[in-house]
Amino acid sequence: MVVHIENLNAFSAALKNAGDKLVVVDFTATWCGPCQKIGPIFETLSKSEDYQNVVFLKVDVDDAADVSSHCDIKCMPTFHFYKNGQKIDEFSGANEQTLKQKINDHK
C-alpha cells in the first residue's frame, strides 16, 4: 500500500512511525510523464509479498511543496530511501530496475 503524504508533519510522522523499516518515497507530479509511467510500478511493488516490511510513501511536489522543499527535490520522479529517519540513498528517473535494486539492497 502506498501512503500519500500531504504535508511535512505527515512526512515526519511517517518516517518516525516506520522505525527501522525501509521507507521508500516517490516524489512525483501529475504533469510529469515519467512519473505517470513509474507510478503504477511503485504501487505494484508496495503490494508485493517481498516488500511487506517496506513502507511506501508518495509525495506530490505540488500538493506537498513543504516536503519537496525540505527534501530539496529538483526533478521528478525522485526516490528517497530512509531508515531510522535518516536518508540512506536516492536516485532520480523512472527506472524500474534501479528502483527494485535499491529496495532490495536496503530492505
Swiss-Prot record:
Q: Where is this site: Contributes to redox potential value?
A: 33-34
Q: Which residues form the signal peptide?
A: none
Q: Please state the protein's primary subcellular location.
A: nucleus
Can you cite a GO biological process for this protein? positive regulation of DNA binding
Keywords of this protein's UniProt record, alphabetized?
A: Activator, Cytoplasm, Disulfide bond, Electron transport, Nucleus, Redox-active center, S-nitrosylation, Secreted, Transcription, Transcription regulation, Transport
According to the UniProt entry, its GO molecular function terms are:
protein-disulfide reductase activity
In this protein, the active site sits at 32, 35
Pfam families, alphabetically?
A: Thioredoxin
Cellular compartment(s): Nucleus; Cytoplasm; Secreted
What is this protein's function?
A: Participates in various redox reactions through the reversible oxidation of its active center dithiol to a disulfide and catalyzes dithiol-disulfide exchange reactions. Plays a role in the reversible S-nitrosylation of cysteine residues in target proteins, and thereby contributes to the response to intracellular nitric oxide. Nitrosylates the active site Cys of CASP3 in response to nitric oxide (NO), and thereby inhibits caspase-3 activity.
Name this protein carries in UniProt: Thioredoxin
Say which species the protein is native to: Ictalurus punctatus
